[in-house]
Amino acid sequence: MSNTNTTKAKVDMLNGPLFMKILIFALPLAASSLLQQLFNSVDVAVVGRFASSKALAAVGSNAPVISLLINLFIGISMGANVVISNHLGQRDEQSIRHAICTVTLIAAISGLLLMCIGIGVARPILELMDTPSDVLDMAVLYLRIYFIGIPFFLIFNFGAAILRSVGDTRRPLYILVVAGIINTVLNLIFVIGLGMSVEGVAIATAVANAISAAWIIQLLRKEPGAIQLQFKHLRIYKKELKRMLQIGVPAGLQGMVFSISNVVVQSAINGYGAAAIAGSAAAVNFEYYCYYIIVACNGAAISFIGQNYGAQKYDRVRRIYRICLLMGLIGCFIANTLFTWQNQFFLSFFTTDAEVIHYGAIRMEGVLLFQFIACSYEVTGSALRGMGESMLPTIMTVFGTCILRIIWVFAVLPHYTGFAHLLQVYPLSWILTGAMVIIAYKLKMRQICPK
């Protein structure tokens, strides 16, 4: 790609009107996240329609485990985004180069470490979650093959974080479009053409991740200016690493604890049988689709606020937060309502089993319909992280969301055993966490920008 096209892909975050720039930044980011989720959704849909409901349950039961193991490293990539954005706002080119080198090596090392951990703990953690015996072996096989491709997944996500820090969300989207098409074609070949099951969709996902990683590394090597990746200069710079970890580790730990609570909830879901697992696995895809609207607003908040906070443009920081929050609330509410309204239709893409669809509809009506409330703490927490405040939203989210869900499963659910009662904890935890994080944001803004 030429330097001219590279420049056009970037967004000036420090000057001019904000709404359209944030929208232009956020839309490709939302589409990129949706395409990544489509990798998993295609896996779920193909095995659900062309293999079996048990294969669908095997793939779906792995989602909380995968999130648990990768969230720490995704948090560190968020820290890299903030650090690079701050340096861009300060126009510190040497620090930008050091950060690029550091984050690239961290991605490669983390990916290899996570691959080994994931392969090793696949069976023990699924057994700990009370995964039914009739789906356990398939779930273990899927998870182990999936983690063979996890180094490529992390390299792509860290590389995309670098491009997002300079306002470029379009080129990662182009990569994911191609990788998503390849993933879909390989799924159909392996499952329908070759008669494979969960192993086929796992291999297809790993191949798609490898293509994405190779492509984004090539883009970064050809970048002009300070964000160009030069292999001969690769090393870890302690100053940049320390700052990335200060911001990224709390965010990653939040994600891990969040996932632990979801693993506990998934374990409770497993107690309702294979149909409930499969129905929940199908329904959760639509939660992810809607959640990635929030993720796009999170990414915009981190990058825009990161640069403007670094440049000490605090009035713009306040306006950026409000725009991102409103975009997330409105966009997520519309998507939540649409999917829930036609839940039978959308669930039929994943399965034709009436009992599975029944459980999926219960989840959509009890969780998905209220998901827009999560914007209150997600976008606000991202705004705080863009200003370098990572620990506070982490602590509040851990208490307001994660601990409440665990308490609910062990203290409340034994007295109200219905599947719908289990799911009520989601909107309750979002309301509590949102209230706490918004108060923290207001206190931070009074500190840096007193009226």
Stretch-by-stretch model annotation:
Residues 13-50, 64-79, 83, 108-115, ...:
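N-terminal transmembrane alpha-helices
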Residues 23, 27, 39, 76, ...:
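Residue-level signal for transmembrane alpha-helical positions in Major Facilitator Superfamily
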Residues 24-43, 145, 179, 208-212, ...:
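Transmembrane helical elements of multi-pass membrane transporters/channels
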Residues 77, 145-164, 172-180, 201-216, ...:
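Short runs within selected transmembrane alpha-helices of multi-pass transporters and secretion channels
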Residues 34, 38-57, 126-133, 189-196, ...:
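Helix-terminus/linker motif at the lipid-water interface of multi-pass membrane proteins
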Residues 1-26, 84-149, 182, 193-249, ...:
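Short alpha-helical transmembrane segments in multi-pass integral membrane proteins
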Residues 56-116, 153-172, 266, 279-337, ...:
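Small-residue-rich hydrophobic transmembrane alpha-helices
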Residues 51-64, 143, 202, 274-289, ...:
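Small-residue hotspots at the loop-to-helix junctions and early N-terminal turns
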